[in-house]
Regions:
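Short, surface-exposed secondary-structure edge patches
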Residues: 2-6, 190, 231
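A short beta-turn/loop motif at secondary-structure boundaries
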Residues: 98-101, 169, 181-183
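Short, conserved beta-turn/loop elements at beta-strand boundaries and strand-helix junctions
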Residues: 78, 141-142, 156, 181-185, ...
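Intrinsic-disorder/low-complexity, polar/charged segments enriched in Ser/Thr/Lys/Arg/Asp/Glu/Gln
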Residues: 129-133, 146, 172-174, 186-188, ...
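RNA pseudouridine synthases
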Residues: 1-155, 265-269
């Protein structure tokens, strides 16, 4: 057939497509099936800070959904040409921290192995400060404070127990908070985690008598229904880099703060973000 031939009625065309085209990508390349929809807070050649929406899991879980935050990040970097799995045998872009499916906010991703090692160590050494905004039921007796307790994780129930006295298998938790406002039976609270345990904010504030609005696991469904929320009003809205040791290739981040500029539930509450 000549290249300038025009198809005519009755012509038959045969296409030869490799079988691999119809195969499901292997799990390590599942990101190829995902369309990235990222809200990027900050990005450079080493790290990526993404504002994860509530409802999106950070990693693959028992639901086996391919659409995870890390898959979206890998897909995004693949499309940019910054991640080429066929050339990279030992490293794939990875998350440095994680938050619950129904918690929104900043998650840090490393673009290279050296960044991942440094970030993991900085997080372990508490040289990276993460602050949260949340809505909690009730009026706090103090405008600010530091609460200490003990937390034990139940792997079977996938929830935690908090107690004021030591628990067998429990770990110490320390939660700092500042009340930013109160109205209609709800407080807007900024929380800093001195320790970072599973469900710490949700379980600790509930233990103090102030469950998060929308939290079905540690709150009351009747209250959540009246509030009109189906997931907890909790956002990891700010990250501060406060290095006390050498930051290596990430030293330029020392002293910098990144935050989500618009948290819907806080804005609807009436909080003025220009104050921050």
């Amino acid at each position: 057939m000549k290249e300038n031939y025009q198809l005519q009625a009755g012509d038959e065309l045969c296409f030869y497509i490799r079988d691999e085209f119809f195969e499901t990508p292997p799990s390590e390349q599942a990101f190829l099936t995902v369309t990235p929809k990222l809200n990027i807070v900050y990005e450079d050649e080493n790290i990526l800070l993404v504002n994860k929406p509530a409802g999106l899991v950070v990693h693959d879980d028992e639901s086996n959904t391919p659409n995870t935050l890390i898959a979206q990040i890998q897909s995004y970097l693949y499309q940019k040409g910054e991640y080429l799995p066929e050339r990279e045998n030992t490293f794939a872009p990875a998350l440095c921290n994680r938050i619950d499916r129904n918690t929104e906010g900043i998650v840090i991703a490393a673009k290279n192995a050296q960044t991942l090692r440094i970030m993991n160590q900085k997080i372990k050494d508490r040289e990276i400060r993460k602050s949260y905004l949340c809505l909690a039921f009730g009026r706090f007796s103090k405008a600010s404070g530091e609460a200490r307790a003990y937390l034990r994780k139940d792997e079977n129930k996938k929830q935690v127990t908090v107690c004021d006295t030591p628990l067998t298998g429990g770990r110490t938790i320390v939660t700092r908070y500042q009340v930013l406002g109160y109205k209609d039976g709800v407080s807007l609270v900024e929380v800093d985690l001195v320790t970072g345990r599973t469900h710490q904010i949700r379980a600790h504030l509930a233990h103090l008598g102030h469950p998060l609005v929308g939290d079905g696991k540690y709150g009351k469904n009747a209250d959540n229904k009246r509030a009109g929320r189906t997931y907890q009003a909790l956002c990891a809205y700010q990250v501060e880099f406060r290095f006390t040791t050498d930051g290596g290739i990430l030293s330029y981040l020392d002293g910098r703060t990144f935050r989500v500029r618009d948290v819907a539930f806080a804005r609807q509450f009436g909080y003025d973000f220009t104050k921050k």
